[in-house]
């Protein structure tokens, strides 16, 4: 097994694309990162190892038990807390942070009161699991039967928010309480899956939203004693941010930092875990991230100037994230030109989102 000459090995619970990109980010600093599948064989875990995870929940296996019992599993108790939407939303209420009105849906007798107090349209979400739009239902009085008896107690119900648009912020907290934040990012989701992210520090409301988002996420990380990168997704309603979801890990909406920032979110996470010196983050230029979902590899993407392709090496399946493309340039007109070129190299279902990104940059 390879070892760093400078730092303990960082083991990542989960071996998907996030673990893979953490491994790439560590290499230039001689930080050895080893992503591990849940069913990988157990081994002699070094006493000084650092443990992190690329996902909030994991199955119980001999390996996850081994890692879970290690003294250096950073944020271990926080993963379970935030993986459950009931405890996550309870935390937001405890901190008096804005989020959509909600309740635990325990039984069918709650429906009438729920529609009266929350609204005629509610979003029902599984407490655990369910991501990228899965495990969620939009419920009105006429389709309440969609929530079957076995789901009661295992779901929360939120008010449906007719938001203006969606944003996120990715930040990190160090052991001494210092924090670093990336710019608020505008996101477009389609069918519950993040498809596009756009970053431009010249956006209207950017400075106001940045201050608000940093305060909110900072308050959460301080309360939890969190160390590492965390993401906060929000709805924008007028001049207010409503927290939608928290992710205690590197996040899809932070992928643009690989090209558009002085330190990527993956390197930042490792720096925080190892308590390494870290300057303030510098954003180089406006940036766009395009998720590649259920799309076969196209070598013509490599011919797009100022584009950075990340291909995950996964089997292509409908709805599966298989890669992403980052674009960054100080001149937004140049990014728009490259997005227009991508319009001819991506399937039809990408066109509306590419047009959304182009309009964002105009």
UniProtKB/Swiss-Prot annotation:
Which reactions fall under this protein's catalytic activity?
5-amino-1-(5-phospho-beta-D-ribosyl)imidazole + hydrogencarbonate + ATP = 5-carboxyamino-1-(5-phospho-D-ribosyl)imidazole + ADP + phosphate + 2 H(+)
Q: Which GO terms describe its biological process?
A: 'de novo' IMP biosynthetic process
GO CC annotations? Answer: cytosol
InterPro entries according to UniProt: ATP-grasp (IPR011761), ATP-grasp_carboxylate-amine (IPR003135), ATP_grasp_subdomain_1 (IPR013815), PreATP-grasp_dom_sf (IPR016185), PurK (IPR005875), PurK_C (IPR040686), Rudment_hybrid_motif (IPR011054)
Return any one Pfam family short name: PurK_C
Q: Where does ATP bind?
A: 85, 125, 130-136, 158-161, 166, 244-245
Q: List the SUPFAM superfamilies hit by this protein, alphabetically.
A: Glutathione synthetase ATP-binding domain-like (SSF56059), PreATP-grasp domain (SSF52440), Rudiment single hybrid motif (SSF51246)
| Pathway membership, UniProt | Purine metabolism; IMP biosynthesis via de novo pathway; 5-amino-1-(5-phospho-D-ribosyl)imidazole-4-carboxylate from 5-amino-1-(5-phospho-D-ribosyl)imidazole (N5-CAIR route): step 1/2
> Boundaries of each ATP-grasp domain copy?
89-274
EC identifiers of the protein: 6.3.4.18
> Does the record bear Oxidoreductase in its keywords?
no
Q: Name one GO molecular function term.
A: metal ion binding
Task: Name the domain of life this protein comes from.
Answer: Bacteria
Question: Keywords of this protein's UniProt record, alphabetized?
Answer: ATP-binding, Ligase, Nucleotide-binding, Purine biosynthesis
**Family according to the record:** Belongs to the PurK/PurT family.
Cited function? Catalyzes the ATP-dependent conversion of 5-aminoimidazole ribonucleotide (AIR) and HCO(3)(-) to N5-carboxyaminoimidazole ribonucleotide (N5-CAIR).
The record ties this protein, via NCBIfam families, to: PRK06019.1-4, purK
Q: How does the record describe its quaternary structure? A: Homodimer.
List the protein's name.
N5-carboxyaminoimidazole ribonucleotide synthase
List the gene name.
purK
């Amino acid at each position: 097994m390879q070892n760093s000459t400078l730092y303990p090995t960082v083991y990542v619970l989960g071996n998907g694309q996030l673990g893979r990109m953490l491994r790439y980010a560590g290499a230039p600093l001689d930080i050895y990162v080893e992503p591990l599948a849940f069913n990988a064989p157990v081994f002699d875990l070094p006493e000084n190892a650092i443990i992190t995870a690329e996902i909030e929940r994991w199955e119980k296996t001999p390996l996850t038990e081994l890692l879970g019992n290690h003294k250096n599993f950073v944020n271990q108790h926080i993963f379970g807390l935030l993986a459950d939407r009931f405890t996550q939303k309870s935390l937001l209420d405890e901190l008096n942070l804005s989020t959509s009105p909600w309740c635990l849906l325990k039984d069918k007798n709650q429906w009438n009161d729920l529609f009266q107090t929350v609204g005629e349209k509610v979003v029902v979400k599984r407490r655990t699991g369910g991501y990228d739009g899965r495990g969620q239902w939009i419920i009105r009085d006429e389709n309440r039967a969609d929530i079957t008896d076995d789901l009661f107690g295992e779901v929360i119900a939120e008010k449906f928010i007719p938001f203006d648009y969606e944003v996120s912020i990715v930040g990190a907290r160090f052991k001494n309480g210092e924090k670093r934040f990336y710019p608020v990012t505008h996101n477009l989701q389609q069918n519950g899956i993040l498809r596009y992210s756009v970053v431009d520090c010249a956006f209207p409301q950017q400075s106001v939203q940045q201050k608000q988002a940093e305060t909110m996420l900072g308050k959460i990380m301080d309360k939890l004693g969190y160390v590492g990168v965390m993401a906060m997704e929000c709805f924008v309603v007028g001049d207010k941010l409503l927290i939608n979801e928290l992710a205690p890990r590197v996040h899809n909406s932070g992928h643009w930092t690989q090209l558009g920032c002085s330190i990527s979110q993956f390197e930042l996470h490792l720096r925080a875990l190892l308590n390494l010196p870290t300057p303030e983050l510098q954003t180089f230029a406006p940036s766009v991230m395009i998720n590649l979902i259920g799309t076969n590899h196209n070598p013509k993407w490599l011919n797009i100037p100022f584009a950075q392709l990340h291909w995950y090496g996964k089997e292509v399946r409908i709805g599966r994230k298989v890669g992403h493309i980052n674009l960054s340039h100080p001149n937004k007109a140049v990014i728009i030109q490259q997005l227009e070129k991508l319009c001819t190299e991506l399937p039809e279902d990408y066109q509306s989102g590419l047009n959304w990104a182009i309009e964002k940059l105009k």
